UniProtKB/Swiss-Prot annotation:
Binding site for [4Fe-4S] cluster 1: 74, 79, 85, 314
Sequence similarity: Belongs to the radical SAM superfamily. Lipoyl synthase family.
Record-listed E.C. numbers: 2.8.1.8
Protein's name in the database: Lipoyl synthase
CDD domains reported for this sequence: Radical_SAM
UniProt domain Radical SAM core: residue ranges: 86-303
Presence of the UniProt keyword Magnesium in the record: no
Major subcellular location class: cytoplasm
Catalytic activity: [[Fe-S] cluster scaffold protein carrying a second [4Fe-4S](2+) cluster] + N(6)-octanoyl-L-lysyl-[protein] + 2 oxidized [2Fe-2S]-[ferredoxin] + 2 S-adenosyl-L-methionine + 4 H(+) = [[Fe-S] cluster scaffold protein] + N(6)-[(R)-dihydrolipoyl]-L-lysyl-[protein] + 4 Fe(3+) + 2 hydrogen sulfide + 2 5'-deoxyadenosine + 2 L-methionine + 2 reduced [2Fe-2S]-[ferredoxin]
Organism: Pseudomonas aeruginosa (strain ATCC 15692 / DSM 22644 / CIP 104116 / JCM 14847 / LMG 12228 / 1C / PRS 101 / PAO1)
Length: 327
């Protein structure tokens, strides 16, 4: 199994050119902890079974994304549910490019210096969604710490264009933490709010330094609460990955903190190591434990809890928003 150790006196890599995507070992070279590659990925338990993404609908959606120069987080983050979602004619769109300014070692999205925003992306995204005749869409993004508003205006522009071409559509946004830009980002977001506002805490506070370098647990909680205070009629949502080294007690404590910050919906899923150069899986959480977390979440007052090994923040997001049980 991989181990995480402190760095000491290592030479830093040179400056990355704009538009160059770093992945694997190159991506995590500068984070506060060092990832020692695993010799082999851990064997998944019997309860984790993923559909192979092979169908005409999968190919059709991929071709449509390429045609409009769009990205799906389903592909970029190597989501295990890609086949199921694409085969069902749905996708979670990732805006503002496919290069992230953060280096989270659990994530398979590439890191680097992103290109300038594509001013045509809101229109292209709206056209693609209209072509697919979608009723519920999740829009997410890479982190864009290079932008004055963290990309909030681009989110708003995308929502506005989508609503022009697809009246009645429901839109969920899965936003970054807008580090250092919360006030301006929330002001923009409140003027063109989504139907569901989602921001993932990802893990417990103790593991932030090793799992989410550059992010802050309390900041993320405040982002969700402040949005709720500004737009109280819009549900808020957050999620955790389990298997990074957290304890069950820590998960329960974070769930309680979420409720204290008026978060309405919760997703809990199993962390799966994307490659040898990512954080190792510390445990595979049994489905019975996921079911127990869901029961505890309902007792706490969450309007909906999606909890299961293959649950992801945008997995069956439409059903969760409509109150259906997922897990």
């Amino acid at each position: 199994m991989s181990t995480v150790v402190e760095k000491s006196g290592e030479a830093k890599p040179g400056k990355v050119e704009v538009g160059v995507k770093l992945r694997g070992a190159e991506k995590v070279a500068r984070i506060p902890v060092k990832i020692i590659p695993t010799e082999e990925l851990p064997k998944k338990p019997d309860w984790i079974r993923v559909r192979i993404p092979v169908s005409p609908e999968v190919d059709r959606i991929k071709q449509l994304l390429r045609k409009h120069k769009l990205h799906s987080v389903c592909e970029e983050a190597s989501c295990p549910n890609l086949g199921e979602c694409f085969s069902g004619g749905t996708a979670t769109f990732m805006i503002m490019g496919d290069i992230c300014t953060r280096r989270c070692p659990f994530c398979d999205v590439g890191h680097g210096r992103p290109k300038p925003l594509d001013v045509d992306e809101p229109t292209n995204l709206a056209i693609a969604i209209a072509d697919l005749r979608l009723k519920y869409v999740v829009i997410t993004s890479v982190d864009r710490d290079d932008l004055r508003d963290g990309g909030a205006q681009h989110f708003a522009d995308c929502l506005r264009e989508i609503r022009k071409l697809s009246p009645g559509i429901q839109l969920e946004t899965l936003v970054p933490d807008y580090r250092g830009r919360m006030d301006i980002a929330l002001e923009i977001t409140a003027n063109e709010p989504p139907d569901v506002f989602n921001h993932n805490l990802e893990t417990v506070p103790r593991l932030y330094r090793s799992s989410r370098p550059g992010s802050d647990f309390e900041w993320s909680l405040d982002l969700l609460q402040k949005f709720k205070q500004m737009v109280p009629h819009v549900p808020t949502k957050s999620g955790l990955m389990l298997g990074l080294g957290e304890t069950d007690d820590e998960v329960i404590e974070v769930m309680q903190r979420m409720r204290e910050h008026d978060i309405d919906m919760l997703t809990l899923g199993q962390y799966l190591q994307p490659s040898r150069n990512h954080l190792p899986v510390q445990r595979f959480v049994h489905p019975d434990t996921f079911a127990w977390f869901a029961e505890e979440g309902e007792k706490m007052g969450f309007k909906n809890v999606a909890s299961g090994p293959l649950v992801r923040s945008s997995y069956h997001a439409d059903q969760q928003a409509h109150g259906n049980k997922i897990g």
